[in-house]
Design a protein with these regions (language model features):
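Surface-exposed, polar helix/loop patches in the mature regions of secreted/periplasmic/lumenal proteins
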Residues: 75-132, 140
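N-terminal leader/targeting segments and the immediate start of mature chains
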Residues: 3-43, 53-55, 174-185
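Short, solvent-exposed coil/turn segments at beta-strand boundaries
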Residues: 27, 50-58, 67-73, 114-116, ...
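Non-transmembrane domains of secretory- and envelope-associated proteins
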Residues: 114-116, 124-130, 138-185
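Short beta-strand segments that buttress and anchor functional surface loops
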Residues: 33-37, 58-62, 118-125, 144-148
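A short, amphipathic edge element
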Residues: 13-18, 99-110, 156-161
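An acidic-aromatic
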Residues: 48-93, 152-154
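Short glycine/serine/proline-enriched coil/turn segments at secondary-structure junctions
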Residues: 39-42, 66-67, 125-127, 151
Length: 185
């Protein structure tokens, strides 16, 4: 009995590490997602592709392109032809940090096995965020991420497909006639 209990405990303790290993693969990762956000009474949704390679994260959908690398973020707003350059403070947490498990501020509360999946409960105390990451038990690949901030903001990300790939065709956009806003200080 003790051996079985210890095995369950050890396997649960590695679930978050398994998730991190999968999405932070040296090959890179391409994730097709459906993204839903509700803020007070307003709800929005979109579908897009998340590219992860080393410390670079890109999210692309029909309305925007977001690239995060080395603490700098570039957002291309396609419908209004606008580019915004900004930097992220070390204390800030991005949605990319949550999706990749790439931040020390993420605290793991529990790991629960449910229907051949593992639900990783987490919180980010400094931002009032609580959430869950659902992963496949076999390989640690994520299937769903849900988090809530202060009851007002809820984000639900369904992962439609995911693959580790050494090469991916990143989208390129001609922004020569776009308005540029530079917020980098």
């Amino acid at each position: 009995m003790f051996l079985v209990f210890t095995k369950v405990l050890l396997s649960q303790n590695t679930a978050y590490e398994k998730f991190q290993k999968y999405v932070q693969s040296p090959l890179g990762c391409v994730i097709h997602v459906d993204y839903f956000q509700s803020y007070y009474e307003e709800e929005i949704g979109s579908s897009g592709v998340l590219y992860i390679k080393d410390e670079m994260y890109i999210y692309d959908n029909e309305k925007q392109f977001i690239k995060y690398v080395d603490g700098f973020i570039t957002t291309i707003n396609k419908p209004i032809k606008q580019v915004v350059y900004d930097s992220i403070n070390n204390n800030d947490i991005t949605i990319f940090d949550i999706l990749t498990g790439n931040n020390n501020s993420i605290n793991i509360d529990d790991e629960i096995i449910e229907n051949n999946k593992i639900r990783i409960l987490f919180n980010i105390e400094q931002w009032g965020i609580k959430g869950s990451i659902y992963i496949r038990q076999q390989d640690g690949s994520p299937e769903k991420v849900i988090f809530i901030q202060d009851e007002d903001l809820k984000i639900h990300i369904d992962i439609k497909s995911i693959a580790n790939k050494a090469e991916f065709n990143l989208p390129k956009y001609d922004i020569s006639d776009y308005e540029v806003i530079n917020l980098i200080e």
